[in-house]
Amino acid sequence: MAFLGVPYGRPYRGLGPELPSATAPAALRAASLAFQPYYWNVDVDFGGDLFAGREVLLADAGDVRLVPGDHTGNLERITTVVRTLLRAGTVPIVLGGDHAVTVPVLQAYAEQTGLCIVQIDAHLDWRDEVDGIREGFSSPMRRASELSSVHAMVQIGLRGAGSGREEEFAAARTWGSVLVPARTVHREGIEWVLDRLPQASAYYVTLDADGIDPGIMPGVNAPAPGGLTYWQVFDLLCGIAHRGQIVGFDLTELAPARDPSGVTVAHAVRILLVLIGALAHAGQFG
């Protein structure tokens, strides 16, 4: 498993020169140091060893070198680095950056077949374009649906009035995406959601931090009330890992500067550890 930083926050017109999510990879690395002394303690959430007694190799692949203002070139650089990690036989864990980074990451999976995308997000992200930009943070699921490697999609945690227009929801449903509003998650539970997860040869999980309730993680680009809880995300990641192979993961839209307390980043680091634990306990290591 290799952690890859993509400190990219290219906004649309009128949103300033750069989104605060560009600083997230560095903030996540710094916050992870606080957890380091405790990795080998009993992890109560997993009922014992986080790594399930397995040899788990973790590497930090650094950050993708990005060139300010070179949007197209930066996307290509991201794809190239992720493809290199995949061909080395590792599972990329991508630390964004805004949600636009998911597009070039998924393009690196061109050799994968039967991929199911599991998105945790307050927003639908099916815009075809915004300000003439087709690979921005409002469009990753639309672009994912166009990839030959992707055959299914589940979008979990949708809520609020800003998630998408009727035309985007219609396009997502027509394509076949399974849409699960946050209120449905709270009412029916995670097992209900997992029962609706399509069978797939592999799963890719993309977690937009605003998919989690802002009472837990307030430091995000677009907070929306009513999001998922830590335990729901915990059970979801563990459930996916037991249903099939997780071949990649990204965490996007963190805005560390909007939460000086550091609680948001601390929660995010814990979720990354949960992902590792979920994979280990599902037997996807060693």
Features from the language model and the residues they span:
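Conserved alpha-helical scaffold segments that buttress catalytic/binding sites
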Residues: 1-286
